[in-house]
Amino acid sequence: AKERKQGKSNNNKSQNGNADLIIEHADIRKSLLNMKSIIEGERALCFWLSQQTEVSLNHSDQKIKQDASDMVSLMTPVVKSLFSDLGMEITSDAMQIYGGYGYTKDQGIEQLYRDNRITPIYEGTNSVQAADLVFRKLSNKNGNIINKFLDLIKSETNSNNEKIKPFVKEFNNYLEILKKFSEWTIDRSETNRDCLLYTSDAADD
């Protein structure tokens, strides 16, 4: 993106007709920023889950150990499905940025895309992971685990971090939606499990 020149960006003010680097084009910048944001978010979540795994195995306090184990159990199907789906999205966007050249073997993007394509399939397909989340993990301990997770997130968003304050209100609204969804799912798990088949499809998406 910093080497290839093609077309004129919307901000091109030159009068000589020269093409711009493709990184100057708004859609390319948006794609690169989206990829960067996803990767950094995935890394943060992966590090946190790895830490919880260590705590669940080695902590001396049994309550802390069990709480960490609950978090690992809840988030494992989420992380597996989320990371593999987003991995496909990122490699697809990378190929798009390279253009037709990205479709060839020269740059290796097509190989990365092919390698990523297996990840939603193995270690339990993502639809199986979604069903596990909806049928078992959300209702585990009568929803206490998912509520603990949501409370943990809320405690972070309600901290005194000035950088995230502009986003806190909207983010908390999404947390409430997620909480209502989990409560609805737990209720249906007792009365109408068939409808949860459709819910698991939504969770997979």
Where are these regions (language model features)?
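Hydrophobic alpha-helical bundle architecture
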Residues: 192-196
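DHp/HisKA dimerization-phosphoacceptor four-helix bundle of two-component histidine kinases
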Residues: 30, 34-37, 78-81, 173
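Long, well-ordered alpha-helical segments
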Residues: 1-18, 38-60, 83-98, 136-188
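Terminal amphipathic helices with adjacent charged low-complexity linkers/tails
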Residues: 13-14, 21-28
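Alpha-helix capping/hinge segments and adjacent helical runs
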Residues: 48, 70-151
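Conserved small/polar residues in nucleotide/adenosyl-binding loops
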Residues: 198-205
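Amphipathic alpha-helical segments
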Residues: 27, 31-33, 144-145
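Glycine-rich, mobile lid/loop segments that gate access to catalytic sites or pores
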Residues: 63-64
